[in-house]
Design a protein with these regions (language model features):
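A polyanion-binding, active-site-adjacent surface
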Residues: 2-218
Length: 218
């Protein structure tokens, strides 16, 4: 682990690696003002939860760091863990197609996950894991400063919005995350299994486009 990360974590009052922690104390905020290189370094060397023991590599995020639209997913899968990039494979291809239909190339948006490491067997992340990782995403959102966020999947939407509402109730309306409009929709992997829901996701994309075009007061 880099000396800079030890300094940052020490300033935060946390150990370099805490394998078990109660969810109530799991959230750790990076110091304000950290830039892209520093946040990327913290993520790359992170040992704040047990996922560091099973990952191949971290998956920081990719795309336009000044994007108007930011896409937030759940966690890396096996292929993402191998390649170090979010949304690859069949789900990634479908996401790319969805974005293209909305007028965006993949490189024009910024794509990141709530979790930067893959949970074993693609299980849902624990409260501890999400609590440790969410501050990284929060800082990424601050740096990108998007005009809208598209949350894809139940876990991404619930973790970002701090709710346990099902995705079927979260989609179709505009939410707020620290002043940024958030639109929730189904995960591309779910749409591959349930193609009949693609129309709803297209409606969600149109909602996001409306926010980008006209703004929205949440």
């Amino acid at each position: 682990m880099q000396a800079r990360q030890f300094e940052v974590l020490a300033a935060l009052g946390v150990d370099a690696y805490v394998p078990r922690v109660r969810a109530a104390s799991a959230r750790v905020e990076p110091p304000p003002g950290l830039g892209w290189d520093e946040i990327a370094g913290l993520v790359r060397e992170c040992r704040l939860c047990g996922l560091c023991e099973t990952r191949t590599q971290t998956v920081f995020g990719t795309g336009n760091r000044r994007a108007r639209l930011m896409v937030v997913g759940e966690a890396p899968g096996a292929e993402e863990d191998r390649q170090g990039e979010p949304f690859v494979g069949r789900a990634g291809m479908l996401l790319n197609a969805m974005l293209r239909a909305a007028g965006f190339e993949r490189g024009e948006v910024f794509i990141a996950n709530v979790l930067k490491c893959r949970p074993p067997n693609n299980r849902d992340p624990s409260d501890e894991e999400a609590g440790r990782c969410l501050p990284y995403l929060r800082r990424q959102i601050e740096l990108v400063a998007p005009a809208a966020i598209l949350c894809v999947g139940r876990i991404a939407a619930q973790r970002l919005l701090g709710t346990d509402e099902p995705i079927g109730r979260l989609r179709g309306r505009v939410h707020d995350f620290d002043g940024v409009p958030v639109i929730a929709t189904y995960h591309p992997a779910y749409l591959l299994r349930s193609p009949g829901e693609k129309r709803k996701s297209w409606d969600d994309l149109k909602l996001a486009l409306g926010v980008l075009a006209h703004g929205h007061s949440t």
